[in-house]
């Protein structure tokens, strides 16, 4: 839920703009009791009183679209992956212990490993992720997180492919569309919008995502698997 100071900040604005109807509803439905510091009795309520409008971010349809054209660099890299079925995760790995980071990246990795361990011909997971930067230090920290989670799962584990660094929009669209990428997946539970999920849908491949957050504005049960 939004913090009380966030609601107070919104009420200092003439107009508030958010990227999704989901986000707008969260703020509109958020109500806090105002308590008297001495009597500890309720003396009122804190809620958003200023206008809020939704500005849908959208995606560039000239870039994000279904395609069968791929750069030689991507083709060469993807040939190094023996699996013909991979899930793609695109998103930051934010602060917080397992199950507590906003995008739930660590839990996605753990559940994937637990689900497909000891399976014959398991799928792989491609993780296009980073922390705060694209530095070598950040890359090493993410690699350590992956290894730490792998140590908690016993058995013959499926492969994890870690992709770190900034890609052009056109390169990301090629990733979404590559034939080895069969579906896009995320456990996120804190999206204001969820741009990578929208971009991924434009490849016309399945998207598996949580049924809570800004992306429910454009991900529907008939075109996505909402967990």
Task: Identify the meaning behind each predicted range.
Residues 7-14:
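A conserved, positively charged/aromatic
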Residues 15-73:
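Donor nucleotide-sugar binding/catalytic pocket of nucleotide-sugar-dependent glycosyltransferases
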Residues 206-209, 225-226:
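Short hydrophobic beta-strand element within catalytic cores of glycosyltransferases
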Residues 1-5:
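A short, histidine- and acid-enriched strand-loop-helix "catalytic/donor-clamping" loop
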Residues 61-174:
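Conserved catalytic-core segment of nucleotide-activated headgroup transferases in glycan assembly
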Residues 174-192, 202-206:
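Acidic donor-binding loop of glycosyltransferase active sites
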Residues 194-197, 212:
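Short glycine/serine-rich donor-binding loops of glycosyltransferases
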Residues 99, 187-194, 216-217, 227:
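Nucleotide-sugar-dependent
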